[in-house]
């Protein structure tokens, strides 16, 4: 079996006193020590003020809408590319429509002030390994997801990957508009200025934010007109850098957006669905576990079959 080098959510196998770490899922999370600078990031107060002003502008706006072209890649290979449009309105309304550039497939996320709905007009994506063939056949269409969305207590960014458009998370979480603060912000090292550039005819201040001692770096082209970004680039330093780019356009502040834009009712015959929890797919007593191979943090190959008749402890953690 060929080892699978993956990244993101980390799984630790502890067997006979030995700890082996590897990573799994969509978001990169493990900092690469080789890419961490020994020198502290020097914060520029003026650049930091521009960074804060950007978030303050989002939080103080009555409404905000924009379009974005989203692309992320690693090792020179595209991981996903999509276009999305988002509408945000106080106190707690939101709508995001995303579609894949290659297939046109995607989904819609709607918040009606209290509840979040996520649905797929042309059928939902397949979530591996949660979907076996029969489960997917029965639930691939006419289904939706829903959960409470309290003001400041929900994250559009964390739902974006479920839309099936080929994206992971928005670089800047749109829920910042509603007062949400993403967990990365408490790990902000500082912000520095990279001068000024024009983006589609707009004068922008270019700033760079370092997060988690440089594990994640945001480069932002912030418009001098409305203090909101027009280009965004995120570099996440793991074993292979993951680079995400966004280009914002049609940025509109404080327009009158009718509440109907944020209303949605499941059509007749549609059923509520959710991604099965991992524990729902546990092997039954007596079933043979499938063998698999992963790369350890040291680059060695670890196979489950090597620990036959031994206790295996899977420990899951996440950072970033």
Which stretches of residues belong to each language-model region?
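N-terminal secretory signal peptides that target proteins for export/translocation
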Residues: 1-10
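Bacterial N-terminal signal peptides
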Residues: 14-26
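Boundary at the C-terminal end of the N-terminal hydrophobic targeting segment
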Residues: 25, 29-33
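N-terminal mature ectodomain segment of secretory-pathway/periplasmic proteins
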Residues: 35, 42-128, 211-218, 231
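Gly/Pro-enriched, hydrophobic low-complexity segments
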Residues: 42-45, 69-71, 97, 102-103, ...
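An acidic-aromatic
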Residues: 87-170, 236-245
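N-terminal "domain-start" segment that seeds a small globular fold
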Residues: 275-304
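Short active-site neighborhood of thiol/selenol oxidoreductases, capturing the structured segment around
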Residues: 302-320
